[in-house]
Every structure is written in C-alpha cells, then in structure tokens.
Curated annotation (Swiss-Prot):
The modification N-acetylalanine is found at residue 2. GO terms for biological process: defense response; erythrocyte differentiation; inflammatory response; innate immune response; intracellular signal transduction; negative regulation of inflammatory response; negative regulation of protein localization to nucleus; negative regulation of toll-like receptor 2 signaling pathway. The keyword Ubl conjugation applies. Interacts with RAF1. Interacts with HSPD1. Interacts with PPP2CA; retains PPP2CA into the cytoplasm and excludes it from the nucleus. Interacts with PPP2R2A; the interaction is direct. Interacts with PJA2. Transmembrane segments: none annotated. SUPFAM superfamilies: L domain-like, P-loop containing nucleoside triphosphate hydrolases, Polo-box domain. It comes from Mus musculus. This is Malignant fibrous histiocytoma-amplified sequence 1 homolog. It is found in: Cytoplasm. GO terms for molecular function: GTP binding; protein phosphatase 2A binding; ubiquitin protein ligase binding. Induction: Up-regulated by lipopolysaccharides (LPS) (at protein level). GO terms for cellular component: cytoplasm. Ubiquitinated. Ubiquitination by PJA2 does not lead MFHAS1 to proteasomal degradation but positively regulates its function in polarization of macrophages. The gene is Mfhas1.
Length: 1048
C-alpha cells in the first residue's frame, strides 16, 4: 500500500493496527501467560515439543496466553480447569489441528487465536463446540479448506483466515450473519466467493493477493461495507454494481490491471481513501473528480501524462501521490488544494511548477526528485515548499533571468592529458608562434603541462548565446580521491579522458571502467563523453582498434552490470512470491526473515539502478591537441550535447534577477579576493541586489545548493559566514592533497620567512634551507611534514604556515579548520572545550594520510583485541560489501564522521580501534583482492551475551553514520549483512551472513534462537542478530559540504 502513517485520517493504513489492538487481551480481565523453559526457538526446526503444566487454582482466569511455546498439544486438564476462560491464545506453536480440549471451553470461549501454527485441518467437532466464539484468528497456517461447521458460529464477528491455502469457502459461510470483519488475503481463491454476498453485516473485507480476475455484478449486496481490500487481485475492470457500495470509506485497488473506472464510480460519495497505484491508467480517472470527500488519493506507478484542472474540486484532499508516472505539467489549480499534507511527484517529467505553489504550506511529506525541473530550479525544489514559495515571491519582485551555464568535469587517470585538453578547449588559437597575455599558444609545439591539483576554469563556449562552461579539471593522482566526489554532481557533463598512446585493453578497468562505476554510483543517469587524447601518437589502424576496444569493453561492462542487477532483482521477486512465514521458517531461504516492506524497498532500489544507467555517448572521440580540426569537432560535440534540453534542463533554469545579481556581487572586487564574508557582509550585498534580510536566506540557500558558494545554515560554527571564494578553497584543498614532501617543506620554509606570497613560484624538487635559515628549524619542519605524510597529523600552527598565502588571520584558520571538519577531511584530536582554539595547542588528524596498515600495538593491550575475547564474549559484526565500486575516500571521511561518537581511538590505514564509553569497537576496510571479490567495510564490537545490548549501543550510531554517508551515492549497489557470532567465535573464514535488512526490523515475537545454516546444529541467540530496537534504515541526510558543493 502506498503512503506513510501520519494523522488520524490515514484510515486504511491504520486499520490493520486497529484490528490487532482490538484483538489484544482486555486489561480488565484476569490474565495468565505461561511459557516453557527454553521455548521460543524456531518451531519448525526444534525436534522436541516442550511440555507445559497448568498451575493449580486457575479456575477464575479469563484470559490464557500459551503462545510462543512450540506446543503440539495443550496442557492436560485445560478444559476442566478453566471454567471461566473467555480468551485463549495459542499463536506461534506447532498445532497441526485444533486440540480437542478446546472443545470443552466452547460454552464460554469468545476469542481464539491459533495463528502462526501448522494447522492443516480444524476438526469439525471442535469447531461445532465453539458456539459462543466472536473472534477467531486462523491466519498463517496451511489450511486447504474450512469445515462447514464454521458457518454455525452464529455469534462470530471477526474472522482472519489470511495466509493459508484456501481455494474456496464453504457454502455455510453465508450463515455468518453477524460477521463484521473478514480477512482472506493471500490464499488461492480463483473467483470472488459468492457466499460472501449474503453477509449483510460485513464492514471490512480483505481478499487481496488472490487471483480473482473479476468481481460479481451483485457485489452491491454488501451495502454495509466500509473498508475493502482488493490489492493484487488481477482485476482488469470493475462492474457497475461495484459503484453501489455506497458505504465505502476506504478502498484498496493497487497492483491490478485497471485502465479505467466506471462512470458510476462517482457515486461512492463517502469514499475518503482510494489507492489506485500500480495499475495501467493513462488518463486521470474523471470519475474521481466529483468525490468531494476524498482525503487520500494514491495514483503512483501508472502511465498518467497530465492532471486535470478540476482536481481543485477535491478540496478535502490531504494526501496525493502521483509519483512514477509520465506527467509533464501540473494544473495551476493544484495550488488551491491548500489542505494537502503529503504531495509526492517524484519520477515524472515536470519542468515547471505552477505559480503560487507556496500556498501549499501545509505539505510536510514532499518528494519531487527525478524531474527535469527548471522553474523553480531543482535545487530550490529539493529544499521544500517554503523555499519554492520564497523563490516564486522573489521572481514576482524582480525580472526573471536565464543564465546558460553548464558544469563540465574532466576526469581520467593520471597523465591522461586532461590539463592539456582543458587549455586547448578553453583558449582560442592564435596564428603563428607563442602568444602572450590573453593571446593563446599555437598548436605546435606544446610545452608539457602538469596538473597542480584540481583546477577550475570558466569557458565561454558560445558568446552569441551566452553559453558558458565551468570546467573542472579533476586531478588523476590517487591522493585527490578523497575530495574528488565533492565535485561530481547531477546536471553536469562528464568528459572521461583516456590516453590512447598508452592505452592497452588490459588497462580498461583502471583507466575507464572504474571511473564509469564511480560516476554512475555518485550521479545515476549522468551523461559521459569518452575522449581519447594523444591521437597523433597512434597509427591509424592502432587508433581505430583502441577506440573500438574501449567501446566494446564499455558495452560489456554495462551488460554485465545490468544482468547482475536483474538477477538480484529476480531473487527479490522470488522471495516476495513466497509467504513471509515460509521465508522466516528456514535460515537457508534467501532474504531469511526480511519483511515484505524491506523486500519491496530493495526491489525498488534495484529497479532504480537499472532505470538510471549512465548515458554514455558513443563513439570514443579521438583528439590530438595539435590538430585544430579535431579540437573544433570536440567543441561542437560538447555544445550540441549541452544544448539538448531533455538531457540538461538546468542549463535553461530561470532565476530571479536579484539572485543572479547577488551571486555576481559576491564575485566583484573588493570582496571577491577575500576567503569568506560574514553573514552581514552578504546581507549588505543583498540590499544592493534588492533583497531584504528576510529574502536573503532563500537566495543564499539556493547559491549553496547549486554550488556557487558555501553557506551552512545548520552549523553553529559556520552559519555566520559565507564562503564565496571557491577557487581559493580549492587551492587550499590542493595544498593538503599534494603528497610531495619537498613541496610541503618548501611552503613551510616560505611561511616561516614571511615569503608566502611566492605561491606562484616554481618549487624546487628538493627543499634545501637557505643560508639565512635556521637548520634546526628546518629539521623540525621536516619532522612535521614526515608526521603528516605517515600519520596524517599536523598541529594548527603548522597548518597556518602551510596556508599562509591564503590565511591572513587566526579567525581565517579557525573557520577553515571547521570547514575541513565538516567536509569530513580531518578532525581535531584535542579540541579545547568551551573556548576557542589555541593555535599551537590543537592537533588535527587527516585519516587519508595514515600509512600504517593496522592501529598501533598499544591499542590492543589489556584484553581489547577482539580475537582474544572469543571465549568470553560474543562478537557483533556488521559488514557492508561493495561488488562494483567502493566510493573513493569513503573510509577516510567515515573515520572523521565517527569521531564524535568514540574515544581512545587508534587509526590504521584500513582499521580503526576505539571505544564507545567502555565498549570496544573496530572499524575495518578490506580492499578487494581480485576482480570477483567485493570491497568490504565492517563495524564490530563484543560483549558477554547478557550485556550484548551494550555492543549494539556501541555500533548502532556508527552504522547510522555510515548510512548517512552512503546516501551521497544514490547509484551505488552495496549489501549489508550481520555476520554469525557463532561462526566468528569458531574462527570461520567464511561466516554465515544474515540479511542486513533485519537491522531495521523488530525482533520476531517469541523467537529466542536462530539456526546458523553453516552448522545446522548450532543456534544463535536472536539478540546477536537483531538490535534491541530497529535502526534507522534511511536517516535524514545531514547537511554537509560533500553533498552540497557537488551540486555546482
């Protein structure tokens, strides 16, 4: 069912919970719950049935709960000992038929729950005796049929026979005149049971997940029906008689084959909730428009292309789901639905939202991603309705402005030729010789160019149309991998540069394949152009063969990835086709114990990955920077792709003129040269742009979201500052990620001598102190450089020396370090509490520089080695596997993110040892050892079994932090597993892995142990697989620079 629980009016979503609550034992009755010692294990696996003995003097007990005991029979003397019993719970046992002793209770028993057993037959005599029964739950059994005697239960009001094997219902069902609630979902019915048409008192009916294929015309006889579930019933049409169900309030028709509704459907005037998701509607059903009382409407996953303007007539609508259709625009009248609280539009083709959209101010659940939005821009829409309102208000205040500007990223292996290609593309040819100043170098010959890190260039590609590219030259050196993902953003054009002169087919995975996986994981559906450089160094035949090989291997990689994902999606489908009880019966089953909801979420993710493959332009474009014709051909290609509106809608986005002016003012002298501005400095610029203070916030937020500047409104340390000079920030990042000891030492020596302005000089390859310098000081600085490159450690005052050309004051340094922490690049080892940083006191750790493979030995002293605890403690280990690609820099950034959660940490290159309070935790990264092996990242802790909750308490925040980081990679395929504690204790090299989805599910009721499939005789305590409370599966994304800056 589509929708989320929110508010009292979510009727259908709450009906099941309400029914379950109604069936729970009444608190004013005298109750008794009995449990067998050791009961609660898997009832399908345990060989011996437990025995229960009734205590004495229980004659006045009115409610008896014998559930979750693995019983095959009831205790001796049950019938004679309980003369006052009204409610009997026998759920989750092993009964193959109703125990005869239950018949002795028939004259006073009103409620019986025998769900989740092995019933294959009820027994006519026992059923006949239950003449006072009002509620009967037989769900989740193996019943092929029901006895005719069931129809004689004249007082029966609620009956649940869902999740059985019923192919038909007995004729006597028509005699259940008091039946108000009937649940027959997930059975094997092949037609709507005619017997039900006689049940005039029926108010709630669920016949979902049966192959009905049609409904009888006289279904109109069920005039009392208020709630009807027909999900997944293979219905193609509805009879006219259906429209006579005038009492209907909630109707579930999702997952059918409906293409239209009868005109008479509009007679269902009491309808408040309607789910038509996952059908075949191509047009919005006109019969819905007169349903003025409708409060929830779900039309997800259909084929709608438009929404009628008359939808404004549904004035009571609170929830509207229209996601994953083909809707190109919304009617202006939709803004009149001012009571809307949920509006889901993602996965459509909407480019422009109606004016006054901000009137929908009550919308709390808002989903709009995967639409080609240009007005308001995508970044504004993703922030929510208040930001859309501010944008539209500002657009009304000032003239709209369109500024065609596209982000272009040059990626590729080191020495691929990116920097030379950037120069050739962005600079005009000057005939004859070398130009100077603004003049361009000629094509022959080129001096060798090397990258100085990440560089940004503005390129006016077509002055007549004002089309500009912002060109990012991403360094190919591995040391920059941790910051490269920040620049990969939606709406950009990716140019993957390959050196054809050195390319060999065996090098494809490192020079092409890994980059495609990386971009696809970070930016699903991104547009990628493959450019081969140094074409002049290849023969004609060699050039053709290499280009064809790249093309062939790209196609093969895409084919293999898509087939792998399709297979995984099929496995999920097969698991969904099996009953949840069957999946939970055996740990050998795929997706053991995983709920249908989690499986559907998994399937949706696989479908998303399959539907959002990279858009790789072919063929490979060979280019020589010495050939002006080839360069011009590449320019023309890039321009033609950029101007494709369906591929790059953001190129034509419309902004309020005041927002554009504000951006331009930030980059004009004198403020353009500063590293940052205070919020009040930006506010003054806002006034010049015509923005009052209350309208400035939305403008700054948009400029941040779109990557023009950095403004962290959620950060106490940074919210009073605006980082507008991104070029200088990138220069600063380059300083930290040049792993060249000579360059770093040279910068420090310049800094100590006050010669920081020599940044643009050509550095010597070996830093030698000048005669005027103190050799002791030079030695000390060399020691700092060595510590940085080996252990990632730098004190704040040395960082200031490194950044002296950029950092003028202590406040600059403090803000910059706060920014680097927010980016996840470093953390402070000893930040003073309650007072500002003292330059020489604070030390910073850059995890990406740590070289020692494992943490220092002293961290493992005093019994803290997990391996050494195998005989006295149970180990918890959560493992993430990455079959296609491991996000570059993820482990380093993760080690920063968890710093606030841990103490006494010791870092290795691939491992972190630390404590959460007094509980040890270990985070380990294991790179893939071969093409077929995945990269893995695991989080582990240990404790004795009675205290295992402390281990869960230790690792759960770390798991959630990792989940937050992984949200930055929406196209990434990865799996999560809980490793078997017993296997780990045995030292198994290949421990069994329970599905990670169990982390977000509550512990199964009444189950104490789970069998490990790797060793059928070994049982794992349920507390070693399920956390005490479910973890957050999709935590709210934290506002961090890694997510925001990449949207430039």
């Amino acid at each position: 069912m589509a929708g989320q629980d929110s508010g009292n009016l979510k009727t259908v979503r709450l009906w099941r919970d309400a029914a379950l609550r109604a069936r729970k034992l009444r608190s004013n009755l005298r109750q008794l719950t009995l449990s067998c010692p050791g009961a609660g294990g898997d009832p399908l696996e345990s060989p011996d049935a437990p025995q229960l003995v009734l205590p004495a003097n229980i004659g006045d007990i009115e409610v008896l709960n014998l559930g979750n005991n693995g019983l095959e029979d009831v205790p001796e003397g049950l019938g004679s000992a309980l003369g006052s019993l009204r409610v009997l719970v026998l759920r989750r046992n092993r009964f193959a038929r109703l125990p005869p002793a239950v018949a002795e209770l028939g004259h006073h028993l009103t409620e019986l729950d025998v769900s989740h057993n092995r019933l294959t037959i009820l027994g006519a005599e026992v059923v006949s005796a239950l003449r006072e029964l009002r509620k009967l739950n037989l769900s989740h059994n193996q019943l092929p049929a029901l006895p005719a005697q069931l129809g004689a239960l004249a007082h029966l009001e609620e009956l649940d026979v869902s999740f059985n094997r019923l192919a038909h219902l007995p004729d006597s069902f028509s005699c259940l005149n008091h039946l108000r609630t009937l649940d027959v979902d997930h059975n094997q019915l092949t037609a709507f049971p005619q017997q039900l048409l006689q049940l005039a008192a029926l108010e709630e009916l669920d016949v979902s997940s049966n192959r009905l294929r049609g409904l009888p015309e006289d279904i109109s006889a069920l005039r009392a029906l208020k709630i009807l579930w027909l999900s997944g019933a293979e219905l193609g049409t509805l009879p006219r008689g259906f429209c006579e169900l005038a009492s209907l309030e909630s109707l579930m028709l999702d997952n059918n084959g409906l293409q239209a509704l009868p005109d008479e459907f509009s007679r269902l005037q009491r309808l408040k909730m309607l789910n038509l998701s996952s059908n075949l509607f191509e047009e919005f059903p006109a019969a819905l428009l007169p349903l003025a009382g409708l409060e929830e409407l779900y039309l997800s996953r259909n084929q709608l292309t438009s929404v009628p303007s008359l939808i404004a007539g549904l004035g009571r609508l609170l929830t509207l789901w229209l996601d994953n259709n083909r809707i190109r625009y919304l009617p202006d009248s939709i803004v009149e639905l001012t009571g809307l609280e949920e509006l889901v539009l993602q996965g459509n083709q909407i480019a422009v939202l109606p004016d006054n959209f901000g009137q929908l101010s009550r919308v709390g659940l808002w989903k709009i991603k995967d639409n080609p939005l240009i007005q308001p821009p995508y970044e504004v829409c993703m922030k929510g309705i208040p930001y859309i309102a501010a944008y539209q208000k500002e657009l009304a205040h000032s003239q709209p402005a369109v500024q065609p500007r596209l982000k272009l990223l040059l990626m590729g292996h080191k020495a691929a030729g990116k920097t030379l290609l950037r120069h050739c593309l962005t600079e005009d040819k000057v005939e004859g010789g070398q130009g100077g100043g603004d003049k361009e170098k000629s094509y022959l010959p080129f001096p060798p160019l090397g990258s100085k890190g990440i560089e940004v260039t503005s390129w006016t590609a077509d002055a007549s149309r004002g089309l500009r590219f912002i060109v990012y030259d991403l360094a190919g050196d591995e040391s920059y991998e941790v910051i490269q993902p920040f620049f990969l953003s939606p709406g950009a054009l990716y140019v993957l540069v390959v050196n054809l002169a050195t390319y060999e087919p065996r090098c494809f995975p490192t020079t092409v394949g890994s980059f495609l996986h990386r971009v696809g994981a970070r930016v699903p559906h991104a547009v990628v152009c493959i450019v081969g450089t140094h074409a002049d160094l290849c023969g004609e035949r060699e050039l053709e063969e290499k280009c064809l090989d790249i093309h062939r291997q790209i196609a093969l990689q895409e084919k293999n990835d898509a087939e792998g994902l399709s297979h995984l999606a099929k496995v999920v489908d097969e698991a969904l086709a099996r009953d949840f009880e069957l999946r939970s019966a055996s740990p050998h089953a795929a997706y053991y114990g995983v709920s249908d909801k989690n499986l559907r979420r998994r399937k949706a993710h696989f479908q998303y990955l399959l539907n959002h493959r990279l858009q790789i332009l072919s063929p490979v474009l060979p280019v020589s920077c010495r050939d002006p014709l080839q360069l011009q051909r590449l320019r023309d290609k890039l321009l033609s792709v950029a101007e494709h509106r369906e591929i790059f809608p953001n190129l034509h986005r419309v902004l309020p003129r005041s927002w554009q002016v504000l951006e331009e003012l930030h980059f004009q002298p004198p403020q353009a040269q500063r590293l940052w501005l205070s919020w009040w400095d930006s506010a003054r610029l806002g006034l010049q742009a015509g923005l009052t203070e209350d309208r400035l916030q939305s403008a700054l937020s948009y400029l941040h979201e779109s990557g023009k500047l950095l403004y962290f409104e959620d950060s106490p340390a940074l919210k009073e500052h605006v980082f507008h000079n991104l070029t200088r920030l990138i220069d600063i990042l380059n300083v930290f990620f040049q792993r060249d000891a000579s360059l770093l030492l040279h910068k420090l020596l310049l800094g100590t001598n006050g010669e920081g302005e020599g940044e643009g000089e050509s550095f010597p390859t070996i830093a030698v102190p000048s005669p005027g310098q103190d050799p002791l000081r030079a030695t000390q600085l060399h020691h700092y450089v060595e510590g940085f490159l080996l252990h990632g450690l730098l004190p704040a005052h040395i960082i200031r020396l490194l950044l002296k050309p950029h950092v003028q004051a202590q406040q600059d340094l403090q803000l910059l370090l706060e920014l680097l922490e927010k980016m996840g690049l470093c953390y402070c080892l000893n930040k003073p509490k309650g007072k500002p940083l003292n330059g020489s006191a604070a030390w910073y750790k850059f995890p990406c520089y740590v070289q020692n493979e494992v943490p220092h030995a002293e961290a493992w002293i005093n019994g803290t080695n997990l391996a050494g605890q195998s005989f006295v403690a149970e180990q918890l280990q959560i493992e993430y596997s990455f079959p296609f690609t491991f996000p570059p820099g993820l482990f380093a950034r993760y080690s920063v993110q968890i710093n606030s959660h841990v103490v006494h940490r010791s870092d290795g290159k691939f491992q972190i040892f630390a404590y959460r309070g007094k509980v040890p935790v270990v985070v380990s990264y294991r790179p893939a050892k071969g093409v077929l092996q995945p990269d893995t990242l695991s989080i582990a802790s240990h404790a004795s079994l009675p205290n295992i909750w402390t281990a869960w308490q230790a690792i759960t925040p770390l798991v959630e932090e990792l989940n937050v980081l992984l949200q930055e990679w929406p196209g990434l395929h990865y799996t999560v597993h809980i490793l078997c504690s017993k296997c780990l204790k045995r030292g198994s090299p290949n421990p069994h892995a329970f599905p990670g989805e169990l982390l977000s599910q509550p512990r199964p009721e009444g189950v104490a142990e789970i069998i490990c499939p790797k060793n059928g005789s070994e049982r794992v305590n349920v507390a070693l697989v399920y956390p005490p409370t479910p973890t957050v599966i999709s935590p709210c994304s934290k506002k961090n620079v890694g997510e925001k800056h990449r949207n430039q």
